[in-house]
Amino acid sequence: GIHITDVSHHIAPDTALDQEAKERCTSVYLPENKINMFPHELANSLFSLRKDELRPALSVIIDTDNRYNMKNYEIKETFIKVKDRFTYDKVDELIGHDSDFNILYNISEKMREKRKAGGAKLFYTPELEITVDENKEITMKIYDRETPSHKLVSELMIAANDITASFCKANAIPIIYRSQPALDDSCVLSDTYDPVNFYQQRKYFKKSEAGIVPLYHYGLGVDCYTQMTSPIRRYNDLIIHRQIKSFLNKKPYFYTNRELEEIIMYSEQILDSVNMITRNRKRYWLLTYLKKMIGSSVDAIVLQNLSDRIIFILKDYFLELNCTNSTNYEKKYSPGDLITVRIETVIPREDIIKVSIIGESEE
């Protein structure tokens, strides 16, 4: 079973706490700070599934055959007591040695294969995680989402959202769905991290959309999709829980389709603003870090060679930059070439960074 903490058990609609969460819409994760949608004291204790403590949950129970294909499912209210908590690294160790984790991993791989057959665009882009402590010390770590444990959790969360959307569609439960238009057939993404391929293909990407009508999600390769797996940090997930519980308990729905459309209009604007702020803050702190490296040389990968400039990405920082081209560069460098650049100027508050190309990397 996939068990999601049931925040709606603790918070009634239109209470002061609910109104504040609705206004915030989402938790915000910045390098220097985290702004919770709910108070930290509640989000990390009463609302969370904690070890050895009984907590209400909304559970998606999946029944599979001996080949790990899903036969049927059930969505129900439960009370869960977590027996053990595992880090991603620990789960990576257990996969291949522990029969229960092997079964879970095999189920998740079968789900991944099914999505791929449904047209899912699976691609890998590592993420640079930037954290800033109280002394403004900047730490950077490359976050690998393609480990077996990360793929396992990701597939199970996608499955829970997919199944929930199908359940709501079949029972005409008014909820917020997410969909994504079909990508151009000429879009061919690499299964492994390839910055040149990603740069060339991203023009075909289309933004996911929220609505009250269940439509195909081409990016994930599923017939319909919603989000209900993070009610602590996404208000719209909390809405889905309330609607499903109303159906299960044969009670009137808390939200009409018209109210859901109003919530979508507001929340999409907030989420766009939050995403922009998050990107800008990450870039600011990355430039602040690189400012200490003025005069240093770093490796970069050429993405495109144009008549007036060369576009490249700093290899260890995933920062896309460009510099003025010259006759020598125009003939010399091709997409995928590894080059060395020198950091010349960095002004974080003005979002300025200037580099110069030294030559081909010796790596």
Residue ranges and their predicted role:
Residues 1-363:
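Electropositive polyanion-binding surfaces
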